[in-house]
């Protein structure tokens, strides 16, 4: 993993403020083994073996983000070149829905969560905002590092992409189920309102 310069106060990929400590370069987040175990866990990409996850992690770099910093912004189409494996801390995922001006909390993510994987694959605008609700430590995989992984370790790169795609498909199916449930709830509520009139 590459280390960050201590004098910078912003991450060049996300434009967010990053915790910088004076002195020698920051140590790796915990260890590559810890990050690999999180990456290969059921909460992330269970399809990867621990050995494969260690190879993927070797293409990531450690980052720290201050509590309160929004490091992914919904609708941002310019800042999609990375994904994050959360190692420590919590991230609040929010979205602004139609006809609302304040964001709705979608979920709170903890260690082992993958964040931003859709953007790294399709370069489309970010679908939600992600804010560190505590100081977080994470491993960042850039699009350039992903391309290097695919070129240098094509089998593992392909397996990683399939695992990420399966995870996105799983979340899509879950979202569809929730939308159907909300549609039934809205229909029931409308019927109740119509009956009272």
Language-model features: locations:
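Cytosolic regulatory regions built on CNB/CRP/Popeye-like sensor folds
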Residues: 1-197
